[in-house]
UniProtKB/Swiss-Prot annotation:
Similarity annotation: Belongs to the frog skin active peptide (FSAP) family. Dermaseptin subfamily.
InterPro entries (UniProt xref): Dermaseptin_dom
Domain of life according to the entry: Eukaryota
Cellular component annotations (GO), alphabetically ordered: extracellular region
Assigned keywords, A-Z: Amphibian defense peptide, Antibiotic, Antimicrobial, Fungicide, Secreted
Protein task: Potent antimicrobial peptide with activity against bacteria and protozoa. Also has activity against fungi. Probably acts by disturbing membrane functions with its amphipathic structure.
Gene Ontology biological process: defense response to bacterium; defense response to fungus; killing of cells of another organism
Signal peptide: none
Name of this chain's protein: Dermaseptin-S2
Organism: Phyllomedusa sauvagei (Sauvage's leaf frog)
Amino acid sequence: ALWFTMLKKLGTMALHAGKAALGAAANTISQGTQ
């Protein structure tokens, strides 16, 4: 179904965005401790 494909795409995008946000947060924290 088309909506299922859209849902999967949205989920993948959200996952990538979450990973990027986590990476940025980890970067900021590690730089703050140095």
